[in-house]
């Protein structure tokens, strides 16, 4: 542990002995770079310094703070879990790993990280970075159940020394030394017993999985304006983008299908529209698919008809009110497209 004591990263959630803050940081760090997380974490802690402050909050407020961090189900599950802890466990985070692991959004990695760092319990926290280190350290090539069990067993042999620090030291090694496509073995405290380093082939391990091409989904969206305000609608709470606001849009086979856009706006929001012109296209990649969005400028023709918002919440907002609501990144690209078209 000499290496960790000397070279560990100075991160705002470390060395504070607060299970809530440790847990929050690990949730935010899933699939997200540390440098991206730091400002989000700091802003969150300023507004919600305790678990109870999260449990008592409005989800829309949490979602606004999370805006841009992506993987929004993390925020939703963290909120649900905090509410459960507040009602069922008197606001105290369970120190039993089985109970903690049963909370929404908590899996083996987060439970191992929180139990080891916050409660000093000897549980490995194995994410992609630590897996990569151990595959190289043990000279394992293929991602099989047998090899994963070997990694877990190996980690349990020395996790007792300083559980949280062991896990965090491996996180730091994976972040700065034993990277996916580049290694700095001369700096690594594990190198002298690392099988792939001793054989001179660390970058060949583990076997790389060929990335699948992201499927492209076509979407058509309507920019609807009235009295210098634009219409935004709220997605229902299901799905990866649940609870976020957006310009009205719908998945289509052909993203120039103007008839389908008209039909969608009529059936869902009781809006009769005519389409004036195409504003442009936006492409945005999420983790599992790409969005190809065609945006059309639309004009309401039944202006006296009340907007039907019984299915989804809807609002007319001015451009300077956009920052009050949480939008997904693809929608922010649409706002940029609108600004360019109006310039």
Task: Cite the ranges covered by each PLM segment.
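Intrinsically disordered, low-complexity, charged terminal extensions of DNA damage-control enzymes
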Residues: 1-10, 15, 175-343
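Catalytic cores of DNA base-excision repair glycosylases
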Residues: 2-184, 190-199, 203, 270-272
């Amino acid at each position: 542990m000499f290496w960790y004591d000397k070279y560990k990263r100075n991160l705002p959630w470390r060395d504070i002995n607060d299970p809530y803050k440790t847990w929050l940081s690990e949730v935010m760090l899933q699939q997200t770079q540390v440098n991206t997380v730091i400002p989000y974490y700091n802003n969150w802690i300023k507004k919600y310094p305790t678990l109870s402050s999260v449990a008592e909050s409005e989800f829309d407020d949490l979602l606004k703070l999370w805006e841009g961090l992506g993987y929004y189900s993390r925020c939703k599950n963290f909120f649900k879990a905090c509410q459960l802890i507040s009602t069922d466990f008197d606001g105290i985070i369970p120190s039993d790993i089985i109970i903690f692991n049963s909370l929404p959004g908590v899996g083996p990695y987060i439970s191992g990280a929180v139990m080891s760092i916050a409660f000093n319990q000897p549980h490995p926290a194995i994410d992609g970075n630590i897996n990569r280190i151990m595959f190289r350290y043990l000279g394992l090539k293929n991602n099989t159940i047998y090899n994963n069990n070997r990694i877990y067993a190996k980690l349990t042999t020395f996790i007792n020394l300083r559980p949280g620090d062991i896990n965090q030291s491996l996180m730091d090694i994976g972040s700065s030394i034993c990277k996916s496509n580049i290694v700095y073995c001369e700096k690594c405290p594990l190198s002298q017993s690392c099988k792939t380093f001793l054989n001179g082939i660390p970058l060949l391990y583990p076997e790389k999985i060929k990335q699948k091409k992201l499927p492209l989904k076509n979407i058509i969206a309507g920019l609807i304006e009235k009295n210098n305000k634009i219409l935004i609608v709220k997605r229902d709470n299901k799905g990866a983008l649940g609870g976020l606001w957006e310009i009205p849009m719908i998945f289509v086979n052909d993203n120039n299908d103007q008839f389908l856009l008209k039909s969608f706006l009529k059936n869902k929001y009781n809006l009769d529209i005519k389409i004036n012109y195409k504003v442009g296209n936006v492409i945005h990649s999420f983790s599992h698919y790409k969005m190809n969005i065609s945006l059309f400028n639309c004009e309401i023709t039944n202006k006296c008809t009340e907007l039907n918002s019984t299915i989804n919440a809807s609002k007319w907002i001015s451009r300077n009110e956009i920052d009050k609501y949480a939008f997904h990144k693809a929608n922010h690209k649409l706002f940029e497209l609108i600004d360019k078209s109006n310039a």
